[in-house]
A protein has these predicted regions:
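Generic hydrophobic-segment detector
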Residues: 4, 41-42, 152-154, 166
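Phosphate/anion-contacting hairpin/loop surfaces
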Residues: 63-161, 167-168, 172-174, 182-186
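Alpha-helical architecture
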Residues: 50, 162-163
């Protein structure tokens, strides 16, 4: 998702949104009408990421975009007709179309005019593993008195986001912690 964010940011940040085209009004959840109603004319302040969510921050609110399992964005500079799984377009003032394609429709588009960090799908997420909030002490505190195996514990997005199977296996190997060891039995120096 970070790679997608970095690829899209130069095309969106600082741009004014000319129009939104929603071809399929229901992805994982219904696309909120405010998304298409509030975004035209808005200026994109930033395209950020929180866990697997892209946060399209504008001067009118924030669109929360999730790729699901099969979603992707493409940047188009022509009037290419949409393909069968092209569900929505974000068209900028300079004529660039950012098109969302999702064959399985597990992706989602949400809208908030509040702080996106307070959104019910974002608020309970743990810290980013490379962020300042994620420390050995934090992980040790969150692991205390937990009988669940350490590997699924550190793969839980409410504990820390972005740790998948491979990263969990590698981190535990380097820390010399067996993956089935109870999370609460790992000593602080190992974290």
């Amino acid at each position: 998702v970070e790679i997608t964010r970095r690829g899209l940011a130069p095309w969106l940040e600082g741009q004014r949104i000319a129009r939104i085209v929603v071809r399929v009004p229901k992805l994982r959840w219904p696309v909120p009408p405010e998304f298409a109603r509030r975004l035209p004319g808005a200026r994109v302040a930033a395209l950020d990421r929180r866990a697997k969510w892209l946060l399209l921050r504008t001067d009118r609110g924030t669109a929360l975009l999730h790729l699901g399992m099969t979603g992707s964005f493409r940047v188009l500079r022509d009037d290419r007709p949409p393909a069968v799984h092209d569900h929505l377009d974000i068209v900028t003032g300079d004529g660039v179309t950012v098109r969302f394609n999702d064959p399985r429709r597990f992706g989602s588009v949400l809208w908030t005019e509040d702080d996106p960090a307070l959104h019910p799908l974002i608020a309970p997420l743990g810290p980013e593993p490379l962020g300042d909030d994620f420390t050995a002490g934090y992980l040790h505190r969150r692991s205390r008195r937990r009988s669940v195996a350490i590997k699924p514990h550190i793969m839980n997005a409410h504990i820390v986001v972005g740790v998948g199977n491979i990263y969990a296996s590698e981190a535990l190997f380097r820390a010399r912690i067996h993956p089935v060891r109870a999370a609460g039995r790992a000593a602080l120096p190992r974290f």
